[in-house]
């Protein structure tokens, strides 16, 4: 007979139910997408595959809100960073990049490894890119030595969202021809973004956040100006070359063996986003972000982002009080409640924890997440006030704007 007596001595906690993955990406992959990916691999030179390729490339245009080309790579977002650089720049070119957090710093490193000169505009990691600073620097660049402006739209390490339309207006006001390159890895399909309307030349994105997929795919959305510039860009490129990609893309194919099962998942993700409607997706993320901030305020803790207009709708980064360790808090929450929160990165290591609320997410999931945080604060001995969860529930219960018809117009 089976012996169903416990084999645990109580030293190790046995977790039941699903793990709560509340880092700001990779995010929870919905069952629908998992089932779609669980399909036989097909011939990637077949008519069936061509239909799949054309469908997902067209669908991604709707997500980026562009009528232009979208390039898809089997790579993480870092690959799409590199692709944006090598297709538009030459050795010795100058670019302007705003320090908004850990990931702007990493993007700077990629550019510098290719011999690009980076004018790194310093920041305190608590505010987004400054349109006034951008206009001032571009106005001073009368010889147009600056070839590109590089901005992280939503800084995943800090929960700060830069205001891209204001940066575009600064470029236009300065009458400067620099390209505008924008990283939307943690904002695409979570926060309103408009590639064409906002005059962005290259948008960078990844699969593992708002698109609700596993890691493994990344994207560049391209303006016609970016495509013209690439003809004279001298940085070495092969795998990342847009022109090599766009030729077979016209018929739904790729110049490499594509990640077929991820493309199945992407097709299902696009269908889910279309069913909900992008405007409603953004509204849902806004609600969950505001409810999370209500909880943080009720706890008496400090939100990293200093400017309310720059609050992120995909994650909230929170300081722990001086003298306490955010990583120890995260460890307590993981041990007791089987929930993962995002760590503080670089200079915020041990000082900040990050709550992800993006992708496939609903009110009850948020309530459970915030319950786990509040119980963890108590268990870890982190000074806080009670009532954060109730503040979030009250926020969620507030009257909502009427949902819009589910459309995903380009």
Which functions belong to the PLM regions below?
Residues 1-40, 392, 400-410:
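N-terminal glycine-rich, Lys/His-bearing helix-loop that initiates the first secondary-structure elements
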Residues 4, 347, 351-410:
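PLP-dependent enzyme catalytic core of the Aspartate aminotransferase-like
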Residues 18-74, 78:
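A glycine-/small-polar-enriched, mobile loop at the entrance of the PLP active site in fold-type I
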Residues 28-29, 208-298:
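Active-site C-terminal subdomain of aminotransferase-like
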Residues 67-96, 100, 104-108:
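Conserved beta-loop-alpha segment that forms the PLP phosphate-binding cup at the N-terminus of a helix
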Residues 129-188, 202:
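Active-site phosphate-binding strand-loop segment of PLP-dependent enzymes
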Residues 196-208:
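Conserved active-site segment immediately N-terminal to the catalytic lysine
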Residues 302-336:
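Conserved PLP-binding catalytic core of the aspartate aminotransferase-like
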């Amino acid at each position: 007979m089976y012996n169903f007596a416990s084999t645990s001595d109580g030293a190790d906690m046995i977790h039941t139910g699903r793990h709560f993955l509340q880092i700001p990406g990779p995010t929870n992959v919905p069952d629908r997408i998992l089932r779609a990916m669980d399909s036989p691999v097909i011939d990637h030179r077949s008519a069936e595959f061509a239909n799949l390729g054309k469908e997902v490339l067209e669908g991604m245009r709707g997500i980026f809100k562009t009528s232009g080309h979208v390039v898809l790579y089997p790579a993480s977002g870092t690959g799409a960073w590199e692709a944006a650089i090598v297709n538009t720049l030459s050795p010795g070119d100058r670019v302007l990049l705003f320090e908004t957090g850990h990931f702007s710093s990493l993007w700077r490193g990629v550019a510098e490894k290719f011999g690009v000169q980076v004018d790194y505009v310093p920041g305190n990691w608590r505010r987004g890119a400054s349109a006034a600073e951008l206009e001032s620097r571009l106005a001073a660049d009368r010889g147009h030595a600056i070839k590109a402006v590089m901005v992280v739209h939503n800084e995943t390490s800090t929960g700060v969202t830069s205001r891209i339309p204001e940066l575009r207006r600064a470029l236009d006001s300065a009458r400067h021809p620099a390209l505008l390159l924008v990283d939307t890895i943690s904002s695409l399909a979570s926060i309103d973004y408009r590639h064409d309307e906002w005059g962005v030349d290259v948008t960078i994105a990844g699969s593992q956040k708002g698109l609700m997929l596993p890691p493994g795919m990344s994207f560049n959305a391209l303006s016609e100006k970016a495509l013209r510039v690439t003809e004279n860009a001298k940085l070495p490129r092969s795998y990342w070359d847009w022109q090599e990609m766009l030729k077979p893309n016209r018929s739904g194919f790729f110049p490499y063996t594509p990640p077929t099962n991820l493309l199945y998942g992407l097709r299902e993700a696009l269908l889910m986003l279309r069913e909900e409607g992008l405007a409603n997706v953004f509204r849902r993320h806004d609600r969950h972000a505001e409810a999370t901030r209500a909880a943080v305020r009720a706890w008496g803790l400090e939100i990293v982002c200093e400017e309310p207009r720059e609050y992120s709708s995909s994650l909230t980064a929170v300081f722990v009080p001086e003298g306490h360790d955010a990583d120890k808090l995260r460890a307590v929450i993981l041990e007791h409640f089987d929930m993962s929160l995002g760590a503080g990165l670089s200079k915020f290591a041990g000082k900040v924890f990050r709550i992800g609320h993006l992708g496939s997410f609903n009110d009850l999931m948020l309530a459970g997440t915030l319950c786990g945080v509040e119980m963890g604060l108590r268990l870890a001995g982190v000074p806080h006030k009670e009532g954060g969860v109730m503040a979030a529930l009250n926020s969620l219960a507030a009257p909502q704007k009427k949902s819009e018809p589910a459309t995903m117009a380009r």
